[in-house]
Amino acid sequence: MFLNNDPMRYITGAVLLSVSSGVLAGTKGKEEPAKRPNILFAINDDQSYAHTSFAGSRFVNTPGFDRVASNGIYFTNCYGGSPGSAPSRSSLVTGRHHWQNKQSGQHASSWMKEHVPFVDLLEASGYYTGFTGKGVDPFQYARNDQDTLWRKGNAAGHPFNKYKYEKNISSDLRTAKGIGLTNYYENFRSFMQQRKDGQPFYFWYGATEPHRVYEKGSWKRNGKSLDQVDVPGFLPDSEEVRGDMLDYAVEIEWADSHLSKMLEYLDSIGELNNTIVIVTADNGMPFPRAKANCFEYGVHVPFAVSY
C-alpha cells in the first residue's frame, strides 16, 4: 500500500493514536486487558527519500527497510519538519513545527521542560523506553540542578550506548572508518533483556549514519561500482561525486544492517508481530542543494511503517 500525502509531522500522532487505542481497549469493564503494541522507531541521520532499494535505487541495498515497507505501508511523499537534524527531530517528537518549540526547535540549543516529547507520555502509561545512538540531538540538556528550566535527559528516552566497536584493530567489523562506534544492535538487545516480562516497550534506534565524514573510497572494498550510481541532476556527474555517493551508500547499508538484526531478534522472541516498526530519516543527504536546504533532496525522506 502506498500513501502519497502524509508529512512527517504526523508521525507522533499516528504512534500515540495506536498506543492509546491499545490502552483504551484494556479499560472496558472487566474484560481481559488487550496486549499493548511495542514500538521500534528507527531514524537515520541525513538520508534522502530515493536511497533505499525499495525506492528503486541501484547503488543502495536496504533489506531491513524493504522488509518493513513490503510488510506494511510505504510513504512515497514524506517530508521532514526541517532540512536540519535538531529542528526536524524536535518537530517529530512534539508534533509541532520546530519554530513553535522556540529554542527547543533550534540546532544545538537548550531543550526546555515545557516542550514534552511523546516518550514521556509512553513512559507514564507504563512503557519501557530507551534509545541508542543519536537521540533527539544536537540539543543541550540539564547539566546540573542549576539548569532548572532545562530538561534532564534526552527527549528520545533513556540511553543504551554501552556496547561499542573497537577501532583500528583487526577484528573491527565496521565497513568504513567514518562509521560510528556504537553497536546499535547489541545495545537494543541489552535493552530488551532488561525489560520486565510482558511490559510494552518503545525504543528509538538513532543511527549516526550516513552523516559525514565518510571514509573516502570505502565503496571500493564493499563491492560497489561507479556505474551503479544515479546522480541527481543538481550535482555534477563526475567520478568524484559518484564515489562520494557510494561512500554515503556504504553508511546507509551499515545502519540498515543493524535494523535487520533488530527485526530478526524481535521475530525470534515472538514480538515482531506485536511491534509497530517505523523507519525514516531526519532530513536529506549531506550534499549541496540537499541537507540544510528546503529543496526536495533536503526534506523528502524515506518512511515506512509495519504492524
Residue ranges and their predicted role:
Residues 2-3, 7, 15, 19-307:
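Formylglycine-dependent sulfatase
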